[in-house]
Amino acid sequence: MKKTLLLIDGSNFIFRAYHAVPPLTTSDGRPTNAIRGFLSMLRVLMKDVPTEYVACVVDPKGKTFRSDIYPEYKANRPPMPEELAVQIPVIFEGVKKEGIPFLQVPGIEADDTIGTLAKRATAEGFTVVIATGDKDYAQLVNEDVILINTMGKDNTWMNTEGVIQKFGVPPDRIIDYLALMGDKIDNVPGVPKCGEKTAVKWINEYGSMDGVIENADKIKGKIGENLRNSLEFLPTARALVTIKTDADLSEEVPTFETLRLREPNREELMDYYNKLEFRTWARELKKSSAAGEVKSLDF
């Protein structure tokens, strides 16, 4: 039976948790809504994907190679709200105290770390499950890599056929699909006014973005003009939306045993819950400790 590696897009989870959970504070005024939401999402996920091999991956501080390619990459993002910023290190602390391997690799974005680990793991016989709400990861899906789309109310599993149903193109055309549309969140320009339907139509008609470029003169109207005006930048857009699968992670993950779940230190975890006033979880942990269970999140 194949082993499963669960790769969690922690950066995506953090922002989703912050915006999904109403303001929540401790009795002395410390914000905890993102912390509570994030750890709650992990609880659901770990029940949905029972496995011994996990990594929670987050973006590093500072710029990466994409900023060298295009200095305006992510330059449009507003500053992180202070109410969230103060919760980030506490979230990281909680992940580690729960016994979940945590990765924040300097100079390498979370998606490139995840892409690289997915490729390495499948080569070693793992099935890989990527938990995210970010559509960019659809480019990694294949017979051994599955997405859990966490954007809906219930986690939705997405294989190759699921990608085609959702986006209208197969996983190996997601990069072209993204490049043609651009990405407003990451400040990656695409073809102006080219939305999902147009990108799918062009790719299905011409086979790929290269095919679209080769046939740009055949596309009529304002959208055709927009396409022709974008031809010079499209290869750069494609490079920006392509997830790397060859990052050097030899130091962080020498073997996949590095990513095996660890038994949490119950005293430290109890102290963490109590400081944050997560009383229900503290009671659950105390009860499970009395019963001799080994995992706090029902892993």
Regions found by a protein language model. Name each.
Residues 14, 34, 46, 87-96, ...:
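Basic, polar low-complexity surface loops/patches
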Residues 67-72:
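Glycine-rich loop at the start of a catalytic domain that most often binds anionic cofactors/ligands
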Residues 1-2, 229, 239-299:
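Low-complexity, acidic/Ser/Thr- and charged residue-rich accessory regions of DNA metabolism proteins
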Residues 33, 37, 197, 207, ...:
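Generic recognition of stable, solvent-exposed alpha-helical segments in well-folded globular domains
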Residues 1-54, 59, 66:
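Non-catalytic, usually N-terminal nucleic-acid engagement modules in DNA/RNA processing proteins
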Residues 10-12, 60-65, 80-89:
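Short, compositionally biased "basic patch" segments
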Residues 2, 24-25, 75-250:
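Extended two-metal-dependent nuclease catalytic cores across DNA- and RNA-processing enzymes
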